């Protein structure tokens, strides 16, 4: 990504780096939902249940190609919810017990809310993920 930023700086050619996490398609969802017992999640400490549907990645990619944005930007992409049966606060308490919680009421109102803020992708591309974890 530093190379992309340097490239844009040197040449003036625009670059958008999309950073999706744990991309799932229909078969991937099915495999995860059938695994028994389900791994401490897909929601283990290394990504805390953050995921995105391949269809949303395709949509963000199309928007990145068609945007009028100028310059260089890195954009995180993830679903609005997490890939786990346990609420987000439980995952945080389990995997990060010594970390002071700074989340707000939004995690009470949306107990499976993702810990990743992807609002920049909405600002730059008008992108909002449409797909969440199946069954939710």
Features from the language model and the residues they span:
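Active-site Tyr-X1-5-Lys
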Residues: 1-15
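Mid/C-terminal beta-alpha module of Rossmann-like enzyme folds, strongest
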Residues: 58-118, 123-124
